A protein has these predicted regions:
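Conserved ABC ATPase signature
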Residues: 129-133, 137
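Helix-to-loop junction immediately C-terminal to a conserved catalytic motif
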Residues: 60
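ABC ATPase C-loop
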Residues: 146-147
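A short, flexible loop at the N-terminus of ABC-type nucleotide-binding domains that lies
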Residues: 2-14, 18-31
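The feature captures the beta-strand-to-loop junction immediately N-terminal to the Walker
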Residues: 45-47
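Single conserved hydrophobic/aromatic residue that forms the stacking wall/gate
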Residues: 166-175
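Conserved ABC ATPase "signature" region
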Residues: 107-125
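Catalytic Walker B motif of ABC-type/P-loop ATPase nucleotide-binding domains
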Residues: 154-158
Length: 175
């Protein structure tokens, strides 16, 4: 009974996970073990080049471990370090639309778009072409996309790298 209940609660678990990039002899990540047993506010802290981004890609399934087991039933959203690596659509609204459940009314879709744009201080940017956005605005748009997607885990890779620190922590904490 407890095992079946644990499988219903979103979780992420690493058991002896190791990873190295192709051509590298040493593992960037070696026998990593941890578990996140429920959604919440979690941070991975480390020096540049220590494998934080790689760890997030492993969690999200973008890359596979060399050894070990990753057990996850989480519905994961990701905000990459460089927003240009994930923005696909020509304007803010269309980018948000590809991240939202389309099985809801148009009225509710509009309200959700308005809500998340307000959360990231981009009210009125709905029709704005993505190519006109600054780096910080693009990063905020990717955070809005993660928020609107209703994922139970959102992974943010260097969310404060684009100099809008005043916004990021309150936005992330309010989710």
């Amino acid at each position: 009974m407890i095992d079946s209940l644990e499988n219903e609660i979103p979780h992420i678990k690493f058991k002896d996970v190791s990873f190295s990039y192709l051509g590298e002899k040493e593992n960037l990540i070696f026998k990593c073990n941890f578990s996140i047993k429920k959604p919440g506010f979690w941070m991975i802290v480390g020096k540049n080049g220590s494998g934080k981004s790689t760890l997030l890609k492993l969690i999200n399934g973008i890359i596979k471990p060399k050894n070990g087991v990753i057990d996850s039933n989480a519905n994961i959203g990701m905000v990459f370090q460089n927003p240009d690596h994930q923005i696909l659509m020509p304007n803010c609204r269309s980018e948000l639309l590809i991240n939202i459940n389309q099985n809801i009314s148009q009225n509710l879709i509009n309200k959700k778009i308005e809500y998340v744009l307000d959360k990231v201080e981009m009210t009125g940017f709905e029709k704005r072409p993505v190519y006109t956005l600054s780096g910080g605005q693009k990063q905020r748009l990717t955070i809005a996309c993660a928020l609107i997607s209703n994922r139970n885990f959102i992974l943010l890779d260097e969310p404060t790298a684009v100099s809008y620190t005043h916004l990021t922590l309150p936005t992330i904490c309010s989710v």
